[in-house]
């Protein structure tokens, strides 16, 4: 098992990575939550049949009372209505401020459960048990929790750090191949922005079997990079913006597909390639880098370009949290392994994307 400690002002928590951790969830939670009597587990309709009873048995074996709440799988559950249902279910279960909420699922479950934990009873302890690769390397680490509004994704949320993150690579075995590779888009992103050697390591292992054989190392490397960024910039005002490489344009592709045609990972993959090509045009990115990135992503079965209208680009740029007034910070690559924010007028960005 590998352990990373995220140290933030006034508090810290561990990210634990290891095969078989799901069956040891009870003892791991008891170690960090000695005074809790109840764990309120939030999961979804895909994950519950696979892993809920295993986690429940482990938690009960450690002396916790367990209440489980299952939401429909999919982005549609990350909404205010589901959040309100969750609050009421927590109150029905008798949740107290000494108890805890555990998210057992992917990014939707983690965001929804985390926002509920941040707001119920003015905040209760929260544990992440991510079951998708995307959630393991991205949304479960860093404390961002949110729900979507009709105006866009993640517009109502909070920063609420977990007490513990448990990552069991075994859960990735049950992911459909497209969902597994969707997570690999975020994995590749870490190599692009911070570690060229890690990018080369991934590019040399394009098959799922090769990647799973190295999964503890992959998860550890990604989480170590994200930890270093989050420790420097918990509230997403500076260094943490680098994690959004590929996301500004990726959100445009998600919007163009009405959030159903393209997965988040596929959109980010295409967004990274578009950002690399943009960087070349702006004189920031080396000319050979886009092809190198496209080859690695194509080998993983991910798209390197997605059709998008000027209107969708404009809508995504308008909602981007890195924008201020008439300008926006776009994350570009100076070289493989080094990302930088590039401030430019929104109008210029939209013109470059035509």
Residue ranges and their predicted role:
Residues 200-311:
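Active-site segments that bind and position negatively charged phosphate/pyrophosphate groups
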Residues 1-100:
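ATP/NTP phosphate-donor binding region
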Residues 108-115, 136-137, 252:
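Short glycine/serine/threonine-rich phosphate/pyrophosphate-binding segments
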Residues 2-4, 12, 185-187, 284-354:
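C-terminal charged capping/lid subdomain of soluble metabolic enzymes
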Residues 16, 115-207:
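A glycine/threonine-rich phosphate-anchoring loop and its flanking beta-alpha core
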Residues 87-104, 113-128:
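Non-catalytic interfacial helical region
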Residues 67-69, 102, 127-129, 164-167, ...:
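Hydrophobic/aromatic beta-strand patches that form the interior of the parallel beta-sheet core
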């Amino acid at each position: 098992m590998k352990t990373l400690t995220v140290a933030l002002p006034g508090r810290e928590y561990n990210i634990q990575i290891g095969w078989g951790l799901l069956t040891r969830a009870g003892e791991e939670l008891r170690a960090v939550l000695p005074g809790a009597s109840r764990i309120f587990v939030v999961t979804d309709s895909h994950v519950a049949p696979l892993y809920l009873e295993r986690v429940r048995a482990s938690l009960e074996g450690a002396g916790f009372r367990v209440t489980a709440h299952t939401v429909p799988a999919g982005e549609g559950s990350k909404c205010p209505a589901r959040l309100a249902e969750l609050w009421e279910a927590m109150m029905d279960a008798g949740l107290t401020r000494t108890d805890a909420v555990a998210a057992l699922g992917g990014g939707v479950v983690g965001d929804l459960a985390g926002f509920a934990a941040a707001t119920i009873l003015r905040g209760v302890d929260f544990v992440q048990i991510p079951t998708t690769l995307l959630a393991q390397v991205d949304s479960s680490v860093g404390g961002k929790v949110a729900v979507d509004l009709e105006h866009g994704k993640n517009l109502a949320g909070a920063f609420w750090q977990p007490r513990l993150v448990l990552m069991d690579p075994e859960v990735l075995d049950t992911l459909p191949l497209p969902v597994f590779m969707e997570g690999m888009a975020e994995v590749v992103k870490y190599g692009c922005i911070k570690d060229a050697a890690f990018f080369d390591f991934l590019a040399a292992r394009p098959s799922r079997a090769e990647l799973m054989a190295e999964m503890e190392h992959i998860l550890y490397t990604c989480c170590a990079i994200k930890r270093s960024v989050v420790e420097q910039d918990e509230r997403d005002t500076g260094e943490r913006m680098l994690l959004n490489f590929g996301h500004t344009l990726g959100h445009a592709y998600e919007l163009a597909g009405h959030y159903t045609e393209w997965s988040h990972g596929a959109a980010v993959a295409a967004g990274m390639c578009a950002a690399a090509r943009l960087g070349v045009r702006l004189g920031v990115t080396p000319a050979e880098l886009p092809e190198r990135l496209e080859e690695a992503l194509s080998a993983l079965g991910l798209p390197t370009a997605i059709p998008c209208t000027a209107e969708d680009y404009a809508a995504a740029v308008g909602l981007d949290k890195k924008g201020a007034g008439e300008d926006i910070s776009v994350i570009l690559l100076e070289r493989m392994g080094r990302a930088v924010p590039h401030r430019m007028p929104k109008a210029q960005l939209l013109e470059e994307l035509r």
